[in-house]
Design a protein with these regions (language model features):
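Catalytic P-loop NTPase motifs of RecA-like helicase/translocase cores
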Residues: 69, 93-94, 127-128, 155-156, ...
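Active-site glycine-centered loops adjacent to acidic/histidine catalytic or metal-binding residues
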Residues: 88, 150, 181
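Canonical P-loop GTPase G-domain recognition
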Residues: 144, 153-212
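Conserved C-terminal guanine-recognition region of P-loop GTPase G domains, centered on the G4
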Residues: 78-83, 103-177, 248-252
Length: 325
């Protein structure tokens, strides 16, 4: 993989691209470990929140709706004892006949197949048919599996979790069971140590200050899509995607970004733009501020809304927009 993106404050020339003067990767001692960990689960159990808690930056977009995550995002966690390459997967789900649903499930299954460790994230006290689907997928992997109960802070009576734990985590299928609140970072450090312990020995693959292998161009599109998730109605965000048409730094060090928001119908276009363009303006303003924080420099963002009918069920469109692996 190419060199990863760094934290805010890195120079513009070194972010989101291959650079020959990247800092050396951390030295690997005899006990140093490095490998991939797939964060897997049904939609909306907090996978992106957990990735962000582990990496230490808001790398994966977070939203109240299922299927916020559409791409596998590699987050990099560097510790003295090891380096974790995190795969944040789309939620595995039953049903969904459109091409994009099939592609999202395929991406999640591929992450399980290539991971050194699989982290099965569920909601504390709740086991659904889709959780069982995830477990069935994990049964095809011989890699270590960790069961993680998230949102324990929402449980009023923690004692009720004991019979639940006996039911879902006591048959030896999982190498370990953890209770966490990803939102509050409760229990996250212990989970991090356990993931590293199950990784294979090896040197780090990325520098200590790199947090993702995704380019700033990709992250910019994700931040725009996050605002679509947060600001639009229940269904429309699933018919929208973002394409970065140009991304360049000017002489003053500001990034000039032009992006297209693609929807499937003219009526959806009108909703995204809003009365007098106010909705599109709000989306752009919030996304721009998020980019300023993540990239550590000023961003000038221009947005357009375009229509491509039924793009989410069009294999050629999915490939163009980066969904096909």
């Amino acid at each position: 993989a190419g060199r990863g993106s760094r934290g805010a404050g890195a120079t513009a020339a070194s972010e989101g691209q291959d650079v020959s003067d990247s800092p050396a990767t951390p030295a690997a001692g005899a006990d140093h470990r490095c490998g991939t960990a797939a964060i897997i689960g049904r939609p909306n159990v907090g996978k992106s929140t957990l990735v962000n808690a582990l990496v230490g930056v808001r790398l994966s977009i977070i939203g109240p709706k299922p299927q916020t995550t559409r791409h596998r995002i590699l987050g990099i966690v560097s510790k003295p004892q090891g380096q974790i390459l995190l795969l944040d997967t789309p939620g595995l789900h039953a049903g969904g006949a459109r091409a994009i649903n099939r592609q999202l499930n395929r991406a999640a299954r591929n992450a399980v197949a290539e991971a050194d460790v699989c982290v099965h994230l569920i909601e504390a006290g709740r086991w659904t048919d889709e959780d069982q689907l995830v477990r069935n997928v994990l049964s095809d992997s011989s890699r270590p599996r960790l069961l993680v109960l998230n949102k324990v802070d929402a449980q009023k009576d923690k004692k009720q979790l004991l019979p639940f734990l006996q039911k879902v985590g006591s048959d030896g299928f999982y190498a370990g069971v953890f209770l966490i609140s990803a939102r509050r970072r409760d229990g996250v450090d212990a989970l991090e140590r356990a993931i590293i312990e199950h990784l294979p020995p090896g040197p780090a693959q990325f520098g200590e200050d790199e947090f993702t292998d995704r380019s700033e161009r990709f992250l910019a599109a994700e931040l725009i899509r996050e605002q679509l998730m947060l600001r639009l109605g229940q269904e429309l965000p699933y018919s929208a995607t973002v394409e970065i048409e140009s991304f360049a730094d000017n002489e003053s060090g500001m990034s000039e970004i032009h992006a297209a928001i693609w929807v499937e119908r003219e009526g959806q276009k009108a909703i995204v733009i809003g009365k007098g363009g106010e909705q599109l303006k709000a989306i752009g303003s919030a996304a721009r501020l998020a980019m300023n924080r993540l990239f550590g420099r000023r961003v000038h963002l221009k947005l357009w809304v375009k229509v491509r009918e039924n793009w989410s069920d069009d294999e050629a469109a999915l490939q163009r927009f980066g969904y096909s692996e």
